Amino acid sequence: MSRTKGGTVTHARHKKVTDAAKGYYGRRKNTFKVARQAVDKANQYATRDRKNRKRQFRALWIQRINAAVRAHDEALTYSRFINGLSLAGIEVDRKVLADLAVHEPEAFSAIVDQAKAALPA
């Protein structure tokens, strides 16, 4: 019985890596060993940055809410606004608040007024 060398499987595996490395610079795009290292590192970055993206968007929403709150009332800060929301029983997440602040300022102003009224004087 002849030996099975698995050339088809190896070729398919190598092709998968080199296809993933398309667009890379230099030997990273066509040398299998270097391409595999580059693709592995790219996957590490992708995994890390999927986590970081959530943090960055939350920070962006907070900045937008803070700017809109201060534009509505200079004495009111972001933290006091969020406290007022919880005291008023308004359960709207930061993503929706930031979207309202950008696209529907009148509705956001109404929410700010309700949160401000709920704060202790």
UniProtKB/Swiss-Prot annotation:
Gene Ontology terms, MF aspect: rRNA binding; structural constituent of ribosome
GO biological process, one term: translation
Alphabetically ordered keywords of this record: Ribonucleoprotein, Ribosomal protein, RNA-binding, rRNA-binding
Top-rank taxon: Bacteria
InterPro entries membership: Ribosomal_bL20 (IPR005813), RIBOSOMAL_L20_CS (IPR049946), Ribosomal_protein_bL20_C (IPR035566)
Pfam family, one: Ribosomal_L20
Gene Ontology cellular component annotations, sorted alphabetically: ribonucleoprotein complex; ribosome
Coiled coil: none
Function statement: Binds directly to 23S ribosomal RNA and is necessary for the in vitro assembly process of the 50S ribosomal subunit. It is not involved in the protein synthesizing functions of that subunit.
Protein family according to the UniProt entry: Belongs to the bacterial ribosomal protein bL20 family.
PANTHER family associated with the record: 39S RIBOSOMAL PROTEIN L20
Name used for this protein in its record: Large ribosomal subunit protein bL20
Upper taxonomic lineage: Bacteria, Pseudomonadati, Pseudomonadota, Alphaproteobacteria, Rhodobacterales
Name of the gene this protein is made from: rplT
